[in-house]
Amino acid sequence: MNIVPSKKLIDKLLYMEVDDNDFHQATLNIMYQEWQTNYIGYTYKEILDWFEDTYDSFAKFAVLIGKYNQQVCNGGHIQYFDNGYANGDGGCFYKHSSSIPLHNELIKLFEKTELKEDELSLKVLKILKKFEIEEEDDEILNYDYLRALDSEYYKLCNEFMELINDYIKHKIIGE
């Protein structure tokens, strides 16, 4: 069964009068604004759970894939891990679990979208599934592997983010 946006999310985005090219970023902004205004003490995982409970799994997927893209494009998969976005607890300088639970949830949600039928999306999904952290004594051991994974993603990320925004726009306004 595919995930779809809730009426509440659709209404919120339409009320915001979002520019056609910004549906994805607008979804991230909704969560970030709530986090900074009303839930400042929450961890990333806690605010994501609140966002999913308030809106839906579709909204959570939009945030997870957006933060993945932002973190990887800014500093690679190592930054994505080190800043806590693959794990959900704490931020930079915290100890994060190499079991990467939020990243695994991203993959599960991705597989519940129609994106799994698109060739470009399948390439990105393959990269997502290849992401893993090998560490010993808080040192990342698979640095070269992660840098190669970064390079793979960088070749696809701009086109993929356009696809994500178009996908979200289509789900919100049906165009």
Predicted regions and their residues:
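Extended, alpha-helix-rich binding/interface surfaces that flank or overlap catalytic cores
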Residues: 2-104, 108-175
